[in-house]
């Protein structure tokens, strides 16, 4: 996991001329309704046999979304909004896996419409609605950060059905990933997903077989940030 500076920690330097975000990660983490959305969504995903999509994933995507924009020089407000969107991006799974990104955006609207400023809410909703590769696109820096953060969370610990990894290629590939790290180089303006894979469990080509669409989306997301996306697996650069 990449860890640089958390919102509000020393090292984050908000621009006094840029208004602060009207809703923060602390606000949504403390909201019992949104907590219910996340826990319920994870139970639905578990029932369908999908990888973990609970609070661990939500908090990690929130943190990395913030860090991506912070490292690349975006405003503290944008980084904070990306953090909120990253935390909430999968709540739509509470209702359905299909079109969960768009469903999630509607749920986010209902939960935040009375406390988030209009522009902030619109930015969060757009990022939530556009984080999946089949229907989404990096429509803003906030959206791009959430995409990169979400797609970088590939890890063995997310797999629930360890006994079926020989049957399901998605579980097998996730189980094979021993370490994932999203490295943001602000000077070179590169965003590199560094994976360590146990090739005894899954071959590198299997990763590309199921994740090619995700990597293409990451490339477009990096371009939205005026950066270049790179992928390394076991130390070898592949994209």
Where are the language model's segments positioned?
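Terminal helices and disordered tails flanking the catalytic cores of nucleotide-processing hydrolases
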Residues: 153-239
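Non-transmembrane, amphipathic alpha-helical segments
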Residues: 50-53, 137, 210
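Charged, low-complexity surface segments at secondary-structure and domain boundaries
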Residues: 9, 133, 199-203
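Divalent metal-dependent catalytic cores for phosphoryl transfer on phosphate-bearing substrates
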Residues: 45-47, 57, 70-184
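Long, highly charged amphipathic alpha-helices
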Residues: 64, 107, 213-217
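Alpha-helical structural motif
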Residues: 20-21, 30-33, 37, 120, ...
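Acidic/His-rich, divalent-metal-binding segments that scaffold phosphate/diphosphate chemistry
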Residues: 2-100, 110-111
């Amino acid at each position: 996991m990449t860890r640089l500076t958390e919102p509000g920690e020393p090292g984050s330097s908000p621009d006094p001329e840029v208004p602060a975000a009207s809703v923060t990660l602390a606000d949504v983490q403390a909201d019992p309704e949104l907590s219910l959305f996340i826990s319920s969504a994870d139970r639905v995903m578990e029932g369908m046999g999908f990888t973990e999509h609970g609070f661990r994933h939500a908090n990690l995507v929130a943190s990395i979304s913030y860090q991506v924009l912070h490292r690349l020089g975006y405003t503290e407000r944008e980084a904070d909004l990306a953090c909120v969107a990253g935390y909430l991006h999968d709540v739509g799974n509470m209702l359905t896996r299909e079109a969960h990104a768009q469903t999630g955006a509607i749920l986010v609207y209902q939960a935040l419409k009375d406390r988030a400023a209009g522009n902030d809410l619109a930015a969060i909703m757009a990022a939530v609605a556009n984080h999946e590769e089949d229907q989404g696109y990096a429509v803003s820096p906030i959206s791009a950060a959430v995409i990169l953060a979400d797609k970088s969370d590939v890890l063995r610990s997310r797999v629930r059905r360890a006994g079926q990894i020989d049957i399901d290629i998605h579980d097998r590939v996730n189980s094979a990933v021993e370490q994932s790290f999203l490295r943001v180089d602000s000077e070179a303006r590169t965003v590199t997903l560094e994976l360590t894979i146990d090739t005894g469990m899954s071959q590198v080509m299997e990763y590309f077989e199921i994740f090619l669409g995700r990597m293409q989306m990451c490339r477009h997301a990096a371009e939205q940030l005026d950066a270049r996306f790179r992928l390394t697996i076991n130390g070898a650069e592949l994209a």
